[in-house]
Amino acid sequence: RFVFNTCGTVVRHVQVDERYAAGTHASNVARVVLEEQAVAVGALDSVTYASIVREYFEPSVATEIAWRLGVQQAACYDVVSACAGPLVAIETLRGRAATDPHWKRGLVSTASLSEGFLGFDIQSIADLDELAAGLTIGNGATATLVGREPFARGGRIVGSYSEGYPGHHPLCRAPVFGVFRSAGSALFALAELVPDHVRRACARFGWAVEEVDVFVSHQPSDRILREVAQALGVPAARVPQLHSFYANTEASAVPIALRHLVDDGTIQPGMKLLLNSAAAGFTLARVGVVWEG
């Protein structure tokens, strides 16, 4: 109860049917998004899986997603950067767009399925610090389209910026044969790195922090987001806290937050959005977007 109250955890969505793995969930969501955006499967030049890879090492999960969708030919690869995966994948696709004139559009998919990889046997204070974060993890799957031309619904990417702080690598880990463990208090303390990274990202995009209308963020804890808003000197309302709706859905958190804020009317055409994530490793990632509706 202490952990839930501290983070603001109310609901955790979990997968209970073991027949449906990451590739299945990711492709199911992708079909919905492709239909909404009126994009044919054959029009995809790339398929990227941007979640934590948990089920197998080869081939790439992206190839499974593409196969389930019926893609016949496209670049397929995984971008694994823990919770920051989708934003790092978008940055990777921006690089591809800059170097490959034939690339037109790509799919970025996530499927955050953590059941079976979390440990809840808390017997000591040390266990509480290392395992408590797992209590707030929820499951989810998302699909995002990135392309040179506008889609029926979306925004224009103005920049991306990711940076690693590998000195903090030991703080969080999910071994192949084991459960997720995180030095919770030390990892959460790294939130102090976020405001400066946000300022540098905005400067790269030609924005002032005060110009950002909505900070669409990873959702590890409502309290952390409130503290970041205070450190940046922006109203808490511009940093929506959605942890209570979905818990921490790892790599799926930012796309889920974006869809939620579009659907509930928070995000309107013309708004400047800063997509934000932090990940084990330690990695910070930002993508600037002007929403076009």
Residue locations for each model-derived region?
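A contiguous, well-structured pocket-lining segment that forms one wall/lid of small-molecule binding clefts
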Residues: 176-243
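Flexible, glycine-rich active-site loops centered on histidine and acidic residues
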Residues: 98-136
